[in-house]
Amino acid sequence: MARLIHVVVAGAGPVGVVAALACAQKGFKVTLLEAAGVIDENPRAATTHPSTLEFIAQVGLIDELTAQGLVARHFQFWDRDSHTRVAQFDHDLLRDETAYPYVVQTEQHKLARMGIKKLAEYPDAAMQFNSRVVAVSQNDGGVAVTVEQGGEQVMLTADYLIGADGGRSTVRKLLGIAFEGYTFPERFTVLTTLHDFEKSKGYCYRNYLAGSEAWANLFKVAGDDMAGRWRAVFPTRESESDEQALADDAVLARLTGIDAACTLRDVVHRNIYNVHQRIAAKFRVGRVFLAGDSSHLNNPIGGLGLNCGVHDAMELVATLEAARAGAPDSDLDRYERRRRTLNIEFIQEQTINNKKRLEEKDPAARQQRLDELRALEADPVRQKAFLMRSSLLASVRQAKTIA
């Protein structure tokens, strides 16, 4: 019996979990490592675009992901200055391009949990919590991963290592890979509330609010109880401390700026975080690969980061499968050529433009950006082209052209 190719995956966020599950389903031996003792359930990404739903279907999680989330056919742009809707975009225009012409709003910790549960069905797959990577070495024959578990260090040997261990990636740092880009001077405040913005103000499940004073994002998620809750994202002022931004008066002022009916008693979570636009100088060093946030970070406007990470995972597993079948080692570089190039052309470019569109302060430029959105909505051909990019379906198509 042929020896199983062993893949170690560092990081049990959704990208690492999808990578591990896809590896197991392709007949690899898999060890999934997570430094923490549990899955992180803090409010993070929740938007799963049509292109990513196709990949989620491939690993057998589409029904559960959809059942645990909210289906969002539309997304809207609003003008905070005039309190009016600017444009609405309809994913149903993609019905001839994908089996999933909609977005599913399912929190990322749910995807990680269901993926780990399914991973347990495969006898050659193992999940290890409280397992932190502390050293990596490699040669032509494999990679050695030193892992700290319960105060002791153990060494795992494998054929390949996937670093999906987040923006502060230990794997990336151990490889000495530069993380090129910048950090925004403002932080983002995320407020989760039970207030029903759809009932009160007519917002749909995904909303982008442009404002000359301050922009906002507003979207609905199901919650673990499936009762529904809303997340509102705001920029902080550069002079504002974390404590000031999360204080009751600031929280209430931000929420009532969207809907005067909001109250503090409906707020169930508040958080603040730094925001980056960064990309790793390399996605591959020998037998070690980076995927997800370990290889790229972007602002969350548009919900593209997690989606791009899942695309990384699926592209990488396909690359490893080709190597197992006899493709030359040089073909492994195709992963970097595809994923790094597409991250720059689709993720970095779109998220930077998304932020500029919402925060524009110059009256003439601001009007031009809003008018462009109106024109896109009015033209089905242009709207579909816009949706092909925002859903990353165009990215998936373009990947196949990069040899």
Segments (PLM) and residue ranges:
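Active-site-adjacent segment of FAD-dependent monooxygenases/related oxidoreductases
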Residues: 44, 49-118, 347
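A conserved short coil-to-beta-strand element within the FAD-binding core of flavoproteins
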Residues: 129-143
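Extreme N-terminal leader/targeting segments of oxidoreductases
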Residues: 1-7, 22-26
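Core beta-strand elements of the Rossmann-like FAD/NAD(P) dinucleotide-binding domain
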Residues: 3, 151-160
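Glycine-rich FAD pyrophosphate-binding loop
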Residues: 24-44
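Conserved mid-domain beta->alpha element of the FAD-binding
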Residues: 11-21, 115, 163, 267, ...
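C-terminal helical "tail/cap" subdomain of flavin- and related membrane-associated enzymes
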Residues: 318-403
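Conserved FAD-binding catalytic core of PHBH/FMO-like flavoproteins
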Residues: 117, 160, 164-275
